[in-house]
């Protein structure tokens, strides 16, 4: 859910939406950001919970899933939240993403779309193709890959550090948006 940008757009476009996050700060920021008047009949629900267990959503009831999960152990969004996958090692992160993919498949209607934005990471100078690992997890759960969009990133917080010649490696200046369909 982050700061609620997708939920704000849904409200402005008169769409129903459910936003979830494990981080209480993100929840409160989103709640504040959604507190504006506009003519809408949309239903906007926000929940403090993990995408690994969205028990309150019925099977085959969601039209579209859009998600941008945190990456494994890169930017930590909390200190001790046991549901925060940003705190996990790559191996545990991928296990958590398998649960997210299962739940996403369960709640999404057939012939509808799931879009997930995720990028690769670098640990100790070694590239970890996290995006493709996550893509394969979603495919293994039954999703059909329809498209891959490469989103270029600009003005990243640590770009100046990366550009430094002494580090001698290519920038990770993109993320993938994987477009899946549930058949």
Language model features: what each stretch is:
Residues 1-183:
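Class I S-adenosyl-L-methionine-dependent methyltransferase catalytic core
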């Amino acid at each position: 859910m982050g700061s609620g940008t997708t939920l704000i757009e849904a409200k402005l476009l008169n769409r129903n939406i459910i936003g979830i996050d494990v981080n209480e700060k993100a929840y409160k920021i989103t709640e504040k950001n959604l507190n504006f008047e506009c003519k809408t009949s949309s239903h906007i629900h926000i929940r403090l919970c993990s995408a690994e267990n969205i028990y309150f959503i019925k099977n085959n009831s969601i039209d579209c899933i859009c998600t941008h999960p945190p990456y494994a152990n890169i930017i930590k969004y909390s200190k001790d939240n046991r549901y925060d996958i940003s705190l996990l090692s790559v191996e545990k992160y991928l296990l958590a993403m398998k649960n997210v993919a299962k739940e996403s498949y369960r709640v999404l209607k057939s012939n509808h779309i799931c879009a997930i934005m995720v990028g690769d990471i670098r640990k100790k100078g070694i590239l970890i193709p996290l995006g493709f690992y996550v893509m394969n997890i979603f495919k293994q759960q039954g999703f059909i890959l329809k498209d891959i969009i490469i989103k270029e990133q600009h003005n990243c917080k640590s770009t100046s550090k990366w550009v430094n010649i002494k580090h001698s490696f290519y920038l990770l200046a993109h993320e993938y948006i994987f477009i899946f369909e549930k058949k």
